[in-house]
């Protein structure tokens, strides 16, 4: 069976690559939904344009970001947090597309996390040279829900570390359509992305799009 024909509803032939207890890569899981996903990505970006956020320390992030769902993750001089209203537009974030919620729930279930219902999706655009430093996802209220991360476009090297920043990180090459899920004992592991290498993807050109689904309920300001 080819990746293009793979139906994520049928997990009998799913290629699963374990990373740690409660963490794994679902190889090619999203590829059969790529057309719908990319159309919805473009619609969200059209409504809430990508932007380069500033860290609390005043540094400009190399990755461009936007959000959809009830909550959106933002960063500025005030810190990291989830908000209901896009601070640049003064309006709620776009609704999360049905294709997003379906994929996130299916991927989480395939990784052993039943009943996952994300209320936040962070859309990251990586262009060559963009990276994401090692960090933990700690701004959510309930660490019992997993993280679901979908890769589209150019390949990237994903870093998956331990419970401390100094722990040695595994390096895993992620391809178009791969989905990483981590939760349970791995929920607070450090993770990041090495600088994106130059390249050209048939559908997305010289970029990588990452969709990160979280349950962030009550982590509001």
Residue ranges with predicted function:
Residues 1-221:
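Non-heme Fe(II) oxygenase metal-center motifs and adjacent flexible, charged/small-residue loops
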């Amino acid at each position: 069976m080819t990746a293009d024909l793979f139906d994520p509803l049928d997990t009998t032939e799913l290629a699963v690559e374990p990373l740690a207890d409660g963490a794994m890569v679902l190889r090619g899981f999203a590829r059969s939904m790529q057309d719908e996903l990319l159309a919805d990505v473009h619609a969200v970006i059209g409504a809430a344009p990508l932007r380069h956020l500033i860290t609390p320390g005043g540094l400009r992030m190399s990755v461009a970001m936007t959000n959809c769902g009830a909550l959106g993750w933002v960063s500025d001089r005030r810190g990291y947090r989830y908000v209901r209203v896009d601070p640049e537009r003064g309006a709620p974030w776009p609704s999360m597309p049905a294709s997003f919620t379906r994929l996130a729930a299916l991927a989480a279930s395939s990784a052993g996390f039943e009943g996952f219902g994300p209320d936040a999706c962070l859309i990251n655009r990586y262009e060559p040279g963009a990276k994401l430093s090692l960090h933990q996802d700690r701004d959510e209220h309930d660490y019992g829900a997993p993280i679901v991360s979908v890769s589209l476009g150019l390949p990237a090297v994903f870093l998956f570390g331990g419970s401390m920043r100094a722990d040695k990180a595994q390096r895993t090459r992620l391809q178009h359509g791969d989905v990483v899920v981590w939760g349970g004992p791995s929920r607070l592991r450090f993770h990041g992305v090495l600088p994106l290498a130059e390249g050209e993807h048939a559908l997305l050109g010289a970029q990588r799009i990452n969709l990160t689904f979280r349950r962030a309920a009550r982590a509001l300001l």
